UniProtKB/Swiss-Prot annotation:
It comes from the Eukaryota. Its EC number is 2.5.1.47. The modification N6-(pyridoxal phosphate)lysine is found at K47. Primarily catalyzes the formation of cysteine and acetate from O-acetylserine and hydrogen sulfide. Can also catalyze the formation of cysteine and acetate from S-sulfocysteine and hydrogen sulfide and the formation of cyanoalanine and hydrogen sulfide from either S-sulfocysteine or O-acetylserine and hydrogen cyanide. PANTHER family: CYSTATHIONINE BETA-SYNTHASE (PTHR10314). It comes from Caenorhabditis elegans. Signal peptide: none annotated. This is Cysteine synthase 3. Belongs to the cysteine synthase/cystathionine beta-synthase family. Keywords: Amino-acid biosynthesis, Cysteine biosynthesis, Pyridoxal phosphate, Transferase. Pathway: Amino-acid biosynthesis; L-cysteine biosynthesis; L-cysteine from L-serine: step 2/2. Pyridoxal 5'-phosphate binds at N78, G182, S183, S184, G185, T186, S270.
């Protein structure tokens, strides 16, 4: 929906996010990199698109009913927040199960939207989350799981919205896309749409180096919240893939900080992973002159208690009020005077 018009509720503002060139990070590279700033969706992540799509389709099918159905979902955080947001608008009780390693900010946002949060043992990984979700759905009255990992309404959201937006915003000149794989909705939905427009477009899924399940390697611990669930999602369409890119957690975090410092774009860790992948692709000689598009998936504010911004949080937590002389000293130090 157009953001130029007044809307009925905040759910109507989902989508039509801007596409921004990375002018500084791409300096010295022979390809251009642009990012869809998905944290400008109402609950501040790309997952707003699929939460609305899955709820819409389930309502049309009569599978869920506002005011009656309890939505129970496993999440690393962003889908849960998006589902809590749309649930609040539509009148659903929402229960989210997430690993205990996910950030405190995510838990707080879920509670702020009125959802219930249940933590699972991180050692059990995604299977542990699913086991808890299945137990709750089985034993709670009127409970239903939308299951983002295998729900076709997930990639369909990106096929209907994100893909066409990228095609329109680049005037059909996009050559390459790369997206982190959590539930696989973005890479599958966008990939399908763009391949229909141009069969030569290259599509690169991105996964954590430390947990490269898509690549056929064992599941392992990593720091890139939101991708690398340790399973191959049902929504994966390998026929679309040009090549799977494996990105290290530390590289993803460093790039997320660079995005803030060099581009004034505050994305999370998976956003950093996407841009690391885009830079890797832009560095390849065969991609000279090409346009590479990826996403900034979520806003950095929900990562301040994680390793990504813990140094900043610790620093500002220790600030105290200053005298005029101290204030001048702080200002001069900041300005290098």
């Amino acid at each position: 929906m157009s953001r130029e018009l007044m809307v009925q509720d905040s759910g109507d503002t989902i989508g039509n996010t801007p596409l921004v060139l990375l002018r500084n990070i791409s300096k010295g590279l022979d390809a251009r990199i642009a990012v869809k700033v998905e944290y400008l969706n109402p609950s501040c992540s790309v997952k707003d698109r699929i939460a609305k799509s899955m709820v819409d389709e389930a309502e049309k099918a009569g599978t869920i009913v506002p005011g009656k159905t309890v939505l129970v979902e496993g999440t690393s955080g962003n889908l849960g927040i998006a589902l809590a947001h749309i649930g609040k608008i539509r009148g659903y009780k929402v229960i989210l199960v997430m690993p205990a390693t996910m950030s405190v900010e995510r838990r707080a946002m879920l509670r702020a939207y009125g959802a219930e949060v249940i933590l699972s043992d991180p050692a059990e990984g995604h299977p542990g989350v699913i086991k808890k979700v299945e137990m709750l759905v089985d034993k709670l009255p009127n409970a239903h799981c939308l299951d983002q990992f295998s729900n076709p309404a997930n990639p369909a959201a990106h096929y209907r919205t994100t893909g066409p937006e990228i095609w329109r915003q680049t005037e059909g000149k996009v050559d390459i896309v790369c997206f982190g794989v959590g539930s696989s909705g973005t890479v599958t939905g966008v990939g399908r749409y763009l391949r229909e427009q141009n069969p030569n477009i290259e599509i690169y899924p991105v996964e954590p180096y430390e947990s490269s399940v898509l690549s056929g390697l064992p599941r392992g611990p990593h720091k890139i919240q939101g991708i690398g669930a340790g399973i191959v999602p049902g929504n994966v369409d390998r026929s679309l893939f040009t090549e799977i890119l494996r990105i290290k957690s530390d590289d993803a975090m460093q790039m997320a900080r660079r995005l803030a410092d060099e581009e004034a774009i505050l994305g999370g860790i998976s956003s950093g992973a996407n841009v690391v992948a885009a830079v890797e692709l832009a560095s390849r000689p065969e991609n000279k002159g090409k346009l590479i598009v990826t996403t900034v998936n979520s806003f950095a504010e929900r990562y301040f208690t994680t390793e990504l911004y813990s140094d900043v949080l610790n620093e500002v937590s220790q600030l105290t009020f200053s005298s005029d002389d101290e204030a001048m000293g702080i200002a001069k130090k900041y300005l290098g005077l």
